[in-house]
Amino acid sequence: MVFILGVNFNEHKLVQKALESFYGLGQQASARILAKYSIHPRAKMGTLPPKIVTALTAELSTMTIENDARRLVLDNIKRLRDMGTYRGRRHAMGLPVRGQQTRNQIANARKLNKIERHG
């Protein structure tokens, strides 16, 4: 098991997929980190030397990921709601925010936009 930022990863997991499992890191950011440390995209977690693992941990600790990224998104939504914008009201009602039709297919938006609705 390889330990990075409080998460244990299996030795057989790809490094790129392990990095993408952190909230706020996508394919491009993980590919950029791999290129920075000269890690092959198909490399597994178990093949990394401890020096690279500590460098990855240091790199990830400087980035806005996990709870910090979630808090940033929620703060942006709260800011929209407090300003009283159209998007903020749509978030508050749990409706689609980006102009989608609401006649039939809003079930997904109602699932994803679950926020405190009153207050």
Swiss-Prot record:
Gene Ontology cellular component annotations, sorted alphabetically: mitochondrial small ribosomal subunit; mitochondrion; peroxisome; small ribosomal subunit
Keyword Mitochondrion found: yes
GO biological process, one term: translation
Record's subcellular location: Mitochondrion
Gene3D superfamilies, per database record: 1.10.8.50, 30s ribosomal protein s13, domain 2
Keyword annotations: Mitochondrion, Ribonucleoprotein, Ribosomal protein
Keyword match Kinase: no
Pfam families reported for this sequence: Ribosomal_S13
Gene Ontology MF: a single term: structural constituent of ribosome
Described function: Component of the mitochondrial ribosome (mitoribosome), a dedicated translation machinery responsible for the synthesis of mitochondrial genome-encoded proteins, including at least some of the essential transmembrane subunits of the mitochondrial respiratory chain. The mitoribosomes are attached to the mitochondrial inner membrane and translation products are cotranslationally integrated into the membrane.
PANTHER family found in the cross-reference section: 30S RIBOSOMAL PROTEIN S13/40S RIBOSOMAL PROTEIN S18 (PTHR10871), SMALL RIBOSOMAL SUBUNIT PROTEIN US13M (PTHR10871:SF1)
Family: Belongs to the universal ribosomal protein uS13 family.
Subunit structure: Component of the mitochondrial small ribosomal subunit (mt-SSU). Mature N.crassa 74S mitochondrial ribosomes consist of a small (37S) and a large (54S) subunit. The 37S small subunit contains a 16S ribosomal RNA (16S mt-rRNA) and 32 different proteins. The 54S large subunit contains a 23S rRNA (23S mt-rRNA) and 42 different proteins.
Name the record gives this protein: Small ribosomal subunit protein uS13m
Lineage, uppermost ranks: Eukaryota, Fungi, Dikarya, Ascomycota, Pezizomycotina
